[in-house]
Amino acid sequence: MKLLLARHGETDWNARGQIQGQSDPGLNETGRAQARALARRLEETGVPLRRLYTSPQKRSAETAAIVGACLGIEAEAVEGLREICFGVWEGHCWEEIAALWPHSYEAYAADRLRSRPPEGES
């Protein structure tokens, strides 16, 4: 069995450097083009795909729907694939986070596994 992992296409938040977490922006036009390019690349590889799983978030579900439509596979949303919650940091870029929440930012930068954003999860 082979497991292929792919990241969702671009959103406007990605393009602006904003943390998304569990916020739910959809793909922008670049992101939709990236999803179509991914589908073409997967077709070219000839690797048979039997299942397609996605996070239930718009950006991931939309990417998977585009890929699935091209490959003739229906995407299945899995709650366990949802992005972690970045709490009050969501919608902000890293520079803003460092300025607004310096202590929690420094702790997170030093050890992402043992620290968490304010009102977020680790």
Describe every region a protein language model picked out:
Residues 1-3, 121:
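Solvent-exposed, charged interface segments at domain starts and junctions
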Residues 3, 7-74:
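Active-site-proximal alpha-helix that buttresses catalytic centers in soluble enzyme cores
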Residues 69-122:
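Phosphate-handling substructures
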